[in-house]
């Protein structure tokens, strides 16, 4: 389990450009979306913003219940992926045992069926890995973590895939392997936020190994080099 980590959503708010895309979307027949459907999209996006705000305020169960209603009643396929990714994360954050297995399956199908937009694919994979660990499907989690390392070209994605592998080793209590992977990430990256994410995992590993002094020193270094890492505004 993480220590001192403030709840952070993986899902960032849609910006104006994203919304313009939704509003002007042309269907497969070359026809513009009807006005009523546009209004539904706008209303749903506003509701998703409200859910995120509630979650960031620490009211996770309230946010989850509101999102579940949105998900169950959504009729616009264009919004399915956005809703599912946020829903999946809140399932993890609320530790919802009732929904975690079905959500893992649903997200896995969405990814493997290419229903997730490329820009959201990394987020979806990382959430799926956490879902798999939560239901003790370690080999599945490792497969998807390695997939992230293999299929993404950018260094940030590869680093996050390696950090996920370290989390899996940590889950298996193989702290030596977990630490090795984290040190590889730290030695390769020049990105301050990636380094902070990796160091935070190493902090957990140190605590689990009983190395409290080293953990405390590491935390001081994280806060000194990247004080915004634990703020609610930070997006992984």
Language-model features: locations:
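Sec-dependent signal peptide recognition
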Residues: 1-8
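Acidic, polar-rich low-complexity tracts and alpha-helical solenoid repeat scaffolds
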Residues: 6, 15-236
């Amino acid at each position: 389990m993480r220590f001192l980590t403030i709840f952070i959503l993986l899902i960032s708010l849609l910006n104006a450009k994203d919304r313009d895309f939704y509003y002007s979307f042309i269907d497969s027949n070359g026809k513009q979306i009807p006005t009523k459907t546009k209004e539904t999209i706008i209303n749903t996006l506003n509701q998703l913003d409200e859910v995120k705000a509630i979650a960031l305020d620490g009211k996770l169960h309230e946010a989850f219940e509101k999102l579940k209603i949105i998900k169950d009643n959504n009729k616009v396929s264009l919004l399915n992926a956005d809703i599912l990714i946020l829903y999946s994360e809140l399932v993890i954050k609320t530790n919802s045992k009732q929904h975690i297995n079905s959500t893992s399956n649903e997200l896995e199908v969405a990814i493997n069926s290419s229903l997730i937009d490329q820009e959201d694919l990394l987020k979806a994979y990382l959430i799926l890995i956490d879902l798999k660990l939560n239901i003790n499907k370690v080999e599945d989690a490792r497969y998807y973590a390695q997939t992230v390392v293999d299929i993404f070209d950018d260094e940030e994605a590869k680093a996050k895939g390696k950090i996920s592998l370290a989390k899996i080793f940590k889950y298996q209590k193989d702290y030596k392997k977990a630490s090795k992977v984290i040190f590889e990430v730290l030695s390769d990256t020049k990105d301050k936020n990636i380094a902070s994410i990796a160091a935070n995992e190493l902090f957990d590993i140190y605590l689990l190994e009983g190395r409290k002094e080293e953990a405390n020193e590491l935390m001081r270094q994280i806060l000194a080099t990247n004080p915004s890492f634990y703020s609610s505004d930070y997006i992984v």
